[in-house]
Amino acid sequence: MEPEFPLEFLVSGTPISQQASSQSRTAWKNVIRAASTHALPEGHWLTEEPISITIFYFPAEPMAGDIDNIIKPILDSLTAHIYFDDRQVERLLVQRFEPEGIFSFDDPSPKLSEAIAGNKPSLYIRLSTDPFEELR
C-alpha cells in the first residue's frame, strides 16, 4: 500500500548535524523513522512519485548552528523508507522558528498546530507528491 500524501508528522528532539558522529546520525535517523511510522500505513510501499518536503524546526532556544547542516540526516532517514531515492526530491523548504518569534500561520494543519503549541525542540515534516502545490 502506497502512503497517502500529503504526509505530516512530528519529531521530538534537537536535529543533529551532518558533521555529527556516524553513531549519532544513525540514532537520529532511527528517531525520525520511528516518528514517521504513525503517519504511514503498515507495510507501506515506497513511492516512486516526485517529492516535495517541508521541514520546520522549532528549537527550545535560539539555534547555535546553521540550518543547512540538519537537512542531510533528515533526508537520509526518509530515503528507502518513504521514497526510493533522494533524486525524487524536487522541492525542499527548510525553516527555523526561534522561540521568541513564532510566525502566525494563516491556516495551519492540525499537525502543524500541534508542532507550534507543543514541546520544543521539535521538527514538523511534511511530504507531498506535488512539488508545485504552493506555486498554484
Give residue spans per PLM region:
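Acidic, proline/glycine-enriched N-terminal capping motif
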Residues: 1-136
